Every structure is written in structure tokens, then in C-alpha cells.
Amino acid sequence: MKASAPTSQPDAIVVGSGATGGVAAMVLAEAGLQVLVLEAGPDLSSRQAFGSEPLNTARRVAQIASGKKRLQRHHPGFWKHNPSLFVDEQRNPYSTPDDAPFLWSRGRQVGGKSLTWGGITLRLSDYEFQAAERDGQGPGWPIGSADLAPYYTRLEQLLEVHGACDGLPQLPDGHFLPPLPLTPGEQHLQECIGRDLGLPLISSRGFNLHRGPGWPRSSSQGCTLARARATGRTQVRSNAVVSHLLLDGDQAKGVVLVDSRTGSQERIDAPLVVLCASTIETLRILLHSSETH
């Protein structure tokens, strides 16, 4: 099927609207660019996205029994959120080698998995960046914790992350709001660990519990994507499944998408394309974009 051309060309295309897509859209839009965000799933209201109990429990039972969420149910967030925020495995199947099973948890809606993640925001340390070299499995990353520190700081301040600076090399300190108070159960655990093991209990590094209507700050819609939209320079297009990139030599010059509702294809050109479709989906798009891979 020949892809139709759009009526206007954005300055940048961001593929994916989750945690990374929201940040990319915000940075580009606030820099003055016209940004088009493409999301494979629907654009839900906060009420639709989060649902309510006991309806969410009924959905879990029905979707597991029907075989739609037999793998997705293993994600911890499946039991805390609306299960409809996880993909239907019958419509989105995947396979793995028998000796190497892999749980691929996916969310296809505006906001992506920023609607279902646990909200724990830890900085990677040099233990992670140099793990392969230390274990004799190859070279380490060409960057380290210090290189990313300024960007971690900007995000921690933007997202209003709570936590404490504990001085641990394997858990780099950040710029946090004061730690959230411990629950009675956590206080008891802290006392037992200190008394029996002589170890401190580290406060969680994450977000305050969201209550009330609207989007939580831990979600793309509650922070970064909201700021991108507020510029008036960001358009979010839902139900747009990106098939592949359009290439000019070794440079991307646009994308071809499929409308999941109609099956029609469309070509959109842009001088900048940012892939934020999650690790595996981003790799699929890249591999599908060139016969030579």
C-alpha cells in the first residue's frame, strides 16, 4: 500500500509518548521546535486509564482467563493498575527460544509504561557502567555516572523526586526533596534490621503517593508531556504504529506509520526523528528500516 503524504511537516518526530518520549518532546518543544509525537495506542483520559476497584479486579480475572494477559500478569504493576494498560497478547504476540524465555511487558497508550511503573528513580552507578569489563564479558560503557549526573539532577528536580543522600558508591546520591515518611511496617523493619544486622534502612527514592483525580507527576501526561503540550508546539497523534524510518543514506528523514484503526499508511517527513518506543520496539523499527539492517 502506498503511503499518503501529510499536510504539514514538523521539525521533529518523537516515536513513543512514555517516560523518554515525554522528556524528548518537552525539550524539543521548549527549544522552539514544532514536535509531532506518535503513539501506537489510544489517548485515554485519566479516568479511563486508571479505572477503579472492584472493576479492575474483574478485568484482571477476565483478561487472564481469556489468555489475553497470561504473560503480562507477571509484571508487578499488573496487580496495582488497570490491567487494560498492558497489551493484549493475542493481538500483540511474540515468541522466544525455548531455552531463553523473556517476559516482555508492554503498554500501548499515550503515556506508555509511565502509567504503570513503580516510580523508583535510582541513578545508575559506575558498577553498572563497568560491569561487563569487571566480569570479563567485554568493554564497559564509554560513559560513566559523572557524565550523566547533570541530566539526572535536572530530571530529579523536574519530577520532584523524594529521597535521602546515603553516600553509597553503588547508589549515587542525587538532588532530592526530603524523604517520604516510613509506614509503620517500614519503621518496624528499620528497627529489626538495625538491631539484628547493624545495617541502616535506606529510604525509597521516588514519588509521593498520588491521590485524587488527574495525572500523577510520575506519568508523562502529568509532567513532561503536559509541558510539551503547553508550548502549543506539540501535537500528539495516537493509534499511529510506526512501521519504519525513511532514510537518506545513513540519516533518517521521516517515518512511515500505519493507522491502527483504518490500516492506512502515511508518510511523514521531518529533519529529526527521535525513537522512544521502548528498547525492543525501537530495535524493531531500526531493523525494519533497512534491507541491510
Model-identified regions with their sequence ranges:
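Conserved N-terminal glycine-rich FAD pyrophosphate-binding loop of Rossmann-like flavoproteins
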Residues: 42-67, 107-118
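Conserved redox-cofactor binding core of oxidoreductases
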Residues: 61-65, 71-87, 93-103, 108-109, ...
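Glycine-rich loop(s) and the adjacent beta-strand/alpha-helix scaffold that form part
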Residues: 27-30, 34-59, 240, 245-246, ...
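Short acidic, glycine-rich loop/turn motifs
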Residues: 92-94, 98, 257-262
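Residues that mark the start of a beta-strand
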Residues: 11, 33-34, 198-200
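Beta1/beta-strand and adjacent pyrophosphate-binding region of the FAD-binding site
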Residues: 5-20, 36
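Residue-level detector of alpha-helix initiation sites
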Residues: 18-19, 184, 280
